[in-house]
Regions:
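Sec-dependent N-terminal signal peptides
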Residues: 3-12
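N-terminal leader/linker segments that initiate helical-solenoid repeat arrays
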Residues: 14-67
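Short coil/linker segments at helix-helix boundaries
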Residues: 28-36, 60-95, 102-139, 149-186, ...
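Short helix-capping/linker turns of helical repeat alpha-solenoids
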Residues: 48-50, 95, 139, 193
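C-terminal/domain-terminus segments
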Residues: 195-233
């Protein structure tokens, strides 16, 4: 009985320590302090290494800190680490939306540092992961956004990359700006406070030659306050697209 009580109290202590570490990490993440957040999340991982939700949080820190790193090597290393945590989360919780979304996000952030072949191969997995995330949680606005970005990207790739994509896919999967628009509109309906949905919808309309709609959504997104770490970079893309329309 005494041994049982000791084990019970020890277990309670571990859970309390874990919860406190995660809470502290969340507070740092809310301030965009990703390295500081990892100082709490990584010790929490040692207490509960099979907690998929925590692994998604860790993945997100490594993915977002890529923006703050000065060189390609550092960005790529951080992105790869983010991807490894996301893949672990998927293995532990294959029926949850967020781990699949994390894989899609990590691959999306890594694609600028890939060669054409690796980029096209990553694109295939992005689509699979984003579609899985949407299927598991149709109310996951960012999953719809990632699926929209996939359609937007593949619908507008250049000739050489398109030819390579055809070789890897065998036959290119259906992708269109129209489907991208549908995905971004769903994302906006689910979360109208995320400016990236508006900016990417506007950019897609611009790619379609629908300038009035492009300007309306780009200006709407650019007028919104920054709430997320990627928002300044998103606005840079939006301003560049708006300038091309002027």
């Amino acid at each position: 009985m005494k041994i049982f009580l000791i084990l019970f109290c020890t277990t309670l202590s571990v859970f309390a320590d874990f919860a406190e570490l995660v809470k502290s990490g969340d507070a740092q993440e809310a301030k965009f302090q990703y390295d500081e957040a990892l100082k709490y999340y990584l010790p929490a991982e040692k207490l509960k290494p099979d907690d998929a939700a925590l692994l998604v949080k860790i993945s997100r820190q490594y993915a977002l800190r890529m923006n703050d790193l000065p060189d390609k090597a550092g960005k790529t290393a951080s992105g790869r680490k983010a991807l490894s945590y996301a893949e672990r989360a998927v293995a532990l919780a294959p029926n949850q939306s967020d781990p699949h979304l994390a894989v899609a996000i990590c691959l999306g952030k890594l694609t600028p540092f890939m060669g054409n072949r690796e980029m096209v191969e990553a694109s295939k997995q992005i689509k699979i992961s984003a579609e899985k995330a949407v299927k598991l949680d149709p109310k996951n606005d960012y999953a719809w956004h990632l699926l929209g970005r996939w359609h937007q990207s593949l619908a507008n790739i250049g000739g050489a990359t398109r030819a390579l994509a055809g070789i890897i896919y065998g036959r290119l999967p259906a992708a269109s700006n129209e489907t991208a628009v549908e995905c971004f509109r769903k994302a906006i309906a689910l979360n109208p406070d995320r400016l990236v949905h508006f900016v990417e919808l506007g950019r897609t309309y611009g790619m379609m030659g629908r300038e009035a709609e492009a300007k309306r959504y780009l200006e709407r997104g650019l007028a919104m306050p920054d709430r997320e770490r990627d928002d300044p970079e998103t606005k840079q893309r939006g301003r560049a697209s708006l300038k091309q329309l002027s």
